[in-house]
Amino acid sequence: MSNQEQLRSKMLSLADLGAQKVVNLVVQYASAESKPIDLLTYMSSGKRVPSLTEECITSIKALLQFLSTMPDSQNKSDHAFILALQSFAQVRAAYLTSSMEPMTRAVVNSANAVQRISVDAPREAHAEYRRGSAPFADWFKAMISTIQAEQEAATMLFQGMSWKNMYSSTISNILQPLLSSVHDQLPII
């Protein structure tokens, strides 16, 4: 291997290492604002469901833009860009599912309690239920609010960028775990 080839190889290795560090920065920025919250407290106090701040979105956007413009010398930089988007989506997905989990558990427990009533007639005729006593309405409002907030944040992140074509897969990766957990609970609810 000639000196020029060695130098080029070293330069590519440094670029890949730098790209990986930028991916880690994306994860750190997203993680800093993705600590699970008590959605019931937010919903009952009338506060808007929190989302990523504009400052965080702007910082992540700049990092992603940097990764998307790196030369495709070994195709690893393109991989780093996609990895950064996937990592961002994983962090936000974990935030959503962790934040919704206590309310989902309350809905499931309420549904289980109603279903435990053993009667000979159809459940609807004899199951005691007081309107508003089940946490379903609050859970549904929280679900819709979190999805809307996440969609707004993702829209801001992708707005005006050359990589807008990655929006649908990224938002899908963010919401899929939450929607899958709801789907898994539907037979109980």
Predicted regions and their residues:
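Long alpha-helical rod scaffolds of large eukaryotic non-enzymatic complex subunits
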Residues: 1-189
